[in-house]
């Protein structure tokens, strides 16, 4: 048998090897590669989805922080407004009380002045009465005579009328 003789056993083995590679490729390797590719794509999609969720979560967190900041700012503004309003109310009450106190003081001063004038008039009236009584008694002692007393009173009245 020569060098170029065909060994049918080796040819059959080669043929079986090629068939085995073909079937392994078709039924094992190709489905495995497809499954691995699908898994890779699924992992990539999951990673993209996770990244999107992370971005959305970050947006929501920043939006929540912004809302919280705005709420704090509004609360601070409300507190400041309430404080200013309270100060204004206190100041208004203070001014009102001050005006009322001034009115009371003015009223008291006016009342005191009226009472003082009344008292002064009463004192003057009483002094005039006492003066008349005193003058009458003095004149009675000085002028025992009724006629002399009348002449003296007429003289004084004439002088007073001339002065007026």
From Swiss-Prot:
Cited SUPFAM superfamilies: F1F0 ATP synthase subunit B, membrane domain (SSF81573)
TM spans (from-to): 10-32
Keyword Transmembrane helix assigned: yes
Lineage: superkingdom: Bacteria
The keyword Cell membrane appears for this protein: yes
Localization per Swiss-Prot or TrEMBL: Cell inner membrane
Topology of the protein relative to the lipid bilayer: Single-pass membrane protein
Keywords: ATP synthesis, Cell inner membrane, Cell membrane, CF(0), Hydrogen ion transport, Ion transport, Membrane, Transmembrane, Transmembrane helix, Transport
Gene Ontology molecular function, alphabetical: proton-transporting ATP synthase activity, rotational mechanism; proton-transporting ATPase activity, rotational mechanism
Assembly: F-type ATPases have 2 components, F(1) - the catalytic core - and F(0) - the membrane proton channel. F(1) has five subunits: alpha(3), beta(3), gamma(1), delta(1), epsilon(1). F(0) has three main subunits: a(1), b(2) and c(10-14). The alpha and beta chains form an alternating ring which encloses part of the gamma chain. F(1) is attached to F(0) by a central stalk formed by the gamma and epsilon chains, while a peripheral stalk is formed by the delta and b chains.
Family that this chain belongs to: Belongs to the ATPase B chain family.
Protein name as it appears in the record: ATP synthase subunit b
Gene: atpF
């Amino acid at each position: 048998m020569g060098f170029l003789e065909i060994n049918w056993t080796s040819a059959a083995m080669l043929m079986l090897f090629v068939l085995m590679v073909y079937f392994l490729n078709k039924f094992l390797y190709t489905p495995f590669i497809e499954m691995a590719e699908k898994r890779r794509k699924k992992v990539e999609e999951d990673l993209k989805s996770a990244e999107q969720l992370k971005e959305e979560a970050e947006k929501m967190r920043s939006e929540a922080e912004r809302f919280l900041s705005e709420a704090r700012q509004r609360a601070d503004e409300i507190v400041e407004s309430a404080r200013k309003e309270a100060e204004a109310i206190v100041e208004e009450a203070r001014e009102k009380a001050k005006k009322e106190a001034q009115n009371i003081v003015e009223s008291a001063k006016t009342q005191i002045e009226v009472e003082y004038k009344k008292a002064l008039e009463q004192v003057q009236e009483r002094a005039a009465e006492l003066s008349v009584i005193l003058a009458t008694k003095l004149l009675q002692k000085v002028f025992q005579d009724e006629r002399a007393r009348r002449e003296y009173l007429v003289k004084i009245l004439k002088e007073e009328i001339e002065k007026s």
